[in-house]
């Protein structure tokens, strides 16, 4: 806190018997010119000093003892930084008292003193102006003109001093007022820069988001989508597998064929006889099947390995037109051949039977109907027929050599000329002619044309006679010819030259008992047989069907024998 003593005023009068107490040191301390010597006071003009006012401390008592006006002001600029300006105008009127003749000459002018006090603290009691008048009892000296001049000069000096100090103070405060707009401008600039930086950041963020979206779009547009269409090879494989599945699961007993109009040029026995077939231009053709087949019996149709497409027999005229015969071909496409030529067969284990069928249901019906003598008991069967057959694997390429050695014969040649069936090498295969040297004329010869191959559909329960596969004697257990028959539907070809038929119905019935050769599939190779499952010793073979009490538990439950392990 800075305190200044603003003014000290000397007394305008003089006291009797002495001069005023030295105000020169105080004025000199304030930088004011020292007042001149005051004249001596009149002996009768002295008055006692007034007592100090109430509530004043020692400072007021000291001020009262001195004949001057003390004005004290205090300012606090460091703590508050701002203050209130208050101008106080103090009017001091002093009326001299003394001799009567001096009162007329010594009229005192009113003196006006301007004092500026800056008060920075409202709570400070010392920052108040205190006016200490000289009092009415004081007498002025006798020389009024001189004192008035001195008082006027002192007043002017004080006024100029106060004005100069105010000007300095205002000049020191002006830079702060000038700096305030600059600070505001700087704040505005910083705010603008912040705004611009925020805008730039937002633009960068939006640009980055746009770039990311563009990148995503580019990546998604460049994804290689695999083609939805399958290749031709895959489609072919799908067709092949579908054909295989349909072939294995189908239960239709008949081969579909368009209605065939029998040729009127043929004899009646040829029309009404067993279904016949003829080979012409590499295709096997056949007529509609007779009533020998039972449509209700489930059996798969001709598989891809069994037959080529059949067509109806062409007229025996020499002027046959191939275009007319081609119209009778089946609408079904040529089935593809399966890669796997192995097929599971079921062999009858009854003594001196050895029948082989391609379905378990067929072999069971065969055993029930032929060997056990049970007809129509398939639903109520006790499962005894399961012990009389076993599974074998047969290669369907076994009949390759059989058809390769057979030359196709046209119907006109077969009707007009002698039998044209070639006899293959006996060292390589067994032919029907080699086996039928002792019996050239059989009941079958009455029911077939000269060299045409009879084709008939047969099923398991009809006990189709054994079919001889050429060159298969080495695979049979007893050294005799190994005979198999197919259920889908077995087709019997007889290559024995015979005379025209006389008894078609009887011959067709006897055909099932005396046929010698059956070729059921296009030839592709040799026969390879897996070791049959039932060839080893088993409880039912060792002890027989009569002694089931001696069988092992596995055999009782129709499982693999655990007592006689292969």
Swiss-Prot record:
Motif (CR1): 537-541
Biased composition, class Pro residues, residue ranges: 32-55
Gene Ontology CC entries for this record: nucleus
Keywords: DNA-binding, Metal-binding, Nucleus, Phosphoprotein, Transcription, Transcription regulation, Zinc, Zinc-finger
Acidic residues bias spans: 101-128
Biased composition (Basic and acidic residues): 91-100, 186-203
Disruption phenotype: No visible phenotype.
Coiled coil region boundaries: none
Zinc finger (C2H2-type): 346-371
Motif (CR2): 555-559
InterPro entries (UniProt xref): CR1/CR2-DNA-binding_regulator, Znf_C2H2_type
Region (Disordered): 1-148, 166-203, 253-324, 409-436, 497-535
Protein location: Nucleus
Gene Ontology biological process terms in this record: regulation of transcription by RNA polymerase II
Summary of the function given for this chain in its UniProt record: Transcription factor which binds to RE2 sequence elements in the MYOD1 enhancer.
Name the record gives this protein: Zinc finger protein 704
Gene source species: Mus musculus
